[in-house]
């Protein structure tokens, strides 16, 4: 081997950069014409992340450009705002629709596919009124349900409040009897004024007075049997004392006089 035809062996050097966390490797090749080429490869450090098949290429430093979406919202100035719109029909995206179209072409052919499309269009036109009727019925059903639910929600609190008010303002039987018997106002002196009718305040005052009178009568009725029992308990000891006390003895002078006579 001559030095002109000899090829120098490639030398590799490994440099570690602790701050950057990367390792750089340089390969140099020498030719007899003193023409050298240096290739630099940079391998990023793996770090503490797991080496999974999804992020393996990213960890090794190989990156691919992301594919651009099909549709973009373009602003007034012609700049893309980053919003993406993916067209879909009945949950079928654009690539799936392309696959379905290719399969349909292979199965039916161009003429058969055109006939199938025409038949589908006719059937859809025929079913349009039925679909509209179904939509109208569903809307009416929803509206009726919402109305019934709203009415129930409104009536339930009204009924509860009305029942609570009735419970709180139920008059006593004596008050109801008085209202049924007489509907005229009564003066404190006992005179009846037929010209005046009961007002709410007077009605409340009368009911309060009647309640007080009923309570006083009940107290008197309960107190009277207690007093009778107390008197009965007090009387027997007096009779016993009268029975136990002996009659008074006569003096001796009175007892001796009849004997002398």
Curated annotation (Swiss-Prot):
InterPro entries: TatA/B/E (IPR003369), TatA/E (IPR006312). It comes from the Eukaryota. Keywords: Chloroplast, Membrane, Plastid, Protein transport, Thylakoid, Transit peptide, Translocation, Transmembrane, Transmembrane helix, Transport. GO terms for molecular function: proton motive force dependent protein transmembrane transporter activity. The chain crosses the membrane at residues 89-109. One of its GO terms (biological process) is protein import into chloroplast thylakoid membrane. Residues 87-88 are lumenal. It is a single-pass membrane protein. GO terms for cellular component: chloroplast thylakoid membrane; TAT protein transport complex. Residues 160-193, 214-261 are annotated as: Disordered. Residues 160-186, 232-242 have a biased composition (Polar residues). Residues 1-86 form a transit peptide. The keyword Transmembrane helix applies. Residues 110-261 are stromal. Its main location: plastid. It is found in: Plastid, Chloroplast thylakoid membrane. Part of the twin-arginine translocation (Tat) system that transports large folded proteins containing a characteristic twin-arginine motif in their signal peptide across the thylakoid membrane. Involved in delta pH-dependent protein transport required for chloroplast development, especially thylakoid membrane formation. TATC and TATB mediate precursor recognition, whereas TATA facilitates translocation. NCBIfam families: tatAE. Belongs to the TatB family. In thylakoid membranes, TATC and TATB form a large receptor complex, containing about eight TATC-TATB pairs, which binds the precursor protein. Twin arginine signal peptide promotes pH-triggered docking of TATA oligomers to TATC-TATB receptor complex, inducing a conformational switch of TATA that results in activation of the translocase. TATA dissociates from TATC-TATB upon completion of translocation. This is Sec-independent protein translocase protein TATB, chloroplastic.
């Amino acid at each position: 081997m001559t030095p002109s035809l000899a090829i120098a062996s490639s030398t590799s050097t490994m440099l570690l950069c602790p701050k950057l966390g990367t390792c750089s490797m340089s390969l140099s090749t020498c030719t007899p014409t003193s023409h050298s080429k240096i290739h630099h490869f940079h391998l990023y450090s793996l770090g503490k992340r797991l080496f999974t098949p999804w992020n393996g290429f990213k960890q090794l430093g190989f990156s691919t450009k992301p594919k651009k979406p099909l549709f973009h919202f373009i602003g007034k100035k012609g700049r893309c705002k980053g919003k993406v719109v993916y067209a879909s029909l009945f949950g079928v995206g654009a690539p799936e629709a392309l696959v379905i179209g290719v399969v349909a072409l292979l199965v039916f052919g161009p003429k058969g596919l055109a006939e199938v499309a025409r038949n589908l269009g006719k059937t859809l036109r025929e079913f349009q009124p039925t679909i509209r009727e179904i939509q109208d019925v569903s809307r009416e059903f929803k509206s009726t349900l919402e109305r019934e639910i709203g009415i129930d929600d409104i009536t339930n609190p009204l009924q509860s409040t009305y029942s609570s008010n009735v419970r709180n303002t139920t008059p006593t039987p004596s008050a109801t009897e008085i209202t049924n018997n007489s509907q005229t106002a009564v003066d404190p002196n006992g005179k009846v004024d037929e010209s005046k009718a009961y007002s709410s305040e007077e009605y409340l005052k009368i009911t309060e007075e009647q309640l007080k009178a009923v309570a006083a009568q009940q107290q008197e009725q309960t107190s009277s049997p207690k007093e009778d029992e107390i008197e009965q308990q007090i009387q027997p000891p007096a009779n016993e004392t009268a029975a136990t006390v002996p009659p008074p003895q006569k003096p001796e002078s009175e007892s001796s006089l009849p004997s002398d006579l």
